[in-house]
């Protein structure tokens, strides 16, 4: 088995996206919320590295995370453009959810811990302690992680259509650098009666 570092891509279909999940991806959090989420087991978000997080906006532009329109709003606006009614927000175990199509696909891109963090921080000494004593406010973001994100964004734009990317957020405040990409899965289908094509939002997976 090869020991070469490998990249990772995980994806999951969702019925919708809520404000809480969107806020986490876009880090629309204040200091108090960081403290609250860090009380949960297996969670740690370093607020002193929050300044390193970023998003890729339309055109492949790097900008501060959370400065663009909330993802849940972009989701509704894009569906309106397509003439598709958004699913109501329901819990996964709700029987009604089984009848709904997946209107969101959430991707997470990451890779080998050492490689990802080298791209993000270079040779800077980052303190990964989880006891709240770390101060990484002086750490700077490396260009390599930005280029990695832009390359991913370009690939997804070509594959799914840039207009269907409603969120592309890179997190450098956790253990390993990673990216959350949120897309609306649009396919064109031909109506049997009219022969006309119409957009359908659906992902089976």
Where are the model-predicted features located?
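N-terminal nicking endonuclease/strand-transfer module with a His-rich metal-binding environment
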Residues: 1-205
């Amino acid at each position: 088995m090869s020991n070469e570092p490998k990249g990772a891509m995980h994806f999951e279909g969702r019925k919708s996206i809520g404000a809480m999940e969107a806020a986490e991806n876009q880090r629309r959090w204040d200091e108090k919320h960081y403290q609250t989420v860090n009380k949960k087991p297996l969670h740690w978000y370093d607020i002193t590295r929050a300044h390193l997080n970023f998003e890729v906006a339309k055109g492949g532009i790097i900008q501060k995370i959370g400065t663009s329109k909330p993802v849940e709003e972009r989701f509704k606006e894009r569906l309106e453009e397509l003439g598709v009614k958004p699913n109501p927000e329901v819990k996964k175990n709700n029987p009604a959810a089984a009848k709904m199509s997946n209107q969101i696909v959430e991707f997470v891109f990451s890779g080998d811990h050492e490689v990802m963090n080298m791209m993000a921080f270079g040779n800077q000494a980052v303190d990964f302690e989880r006891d709240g004593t770390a101060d990484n406010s002086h750490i700077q973001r490396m260009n390599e992680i930005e280029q990695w994100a832009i390359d991913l964004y370009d690939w997804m734009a070509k594959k799914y259509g840039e207009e269907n990317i409603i969120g592309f957020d890179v997190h450098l405040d956790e253990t390993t650098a990673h990216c959350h990409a949120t897309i609306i899965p649009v396919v064109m289908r031909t109506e049997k009666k009219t022969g006309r094509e119409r957009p359908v939002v659906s992902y089976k997976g």
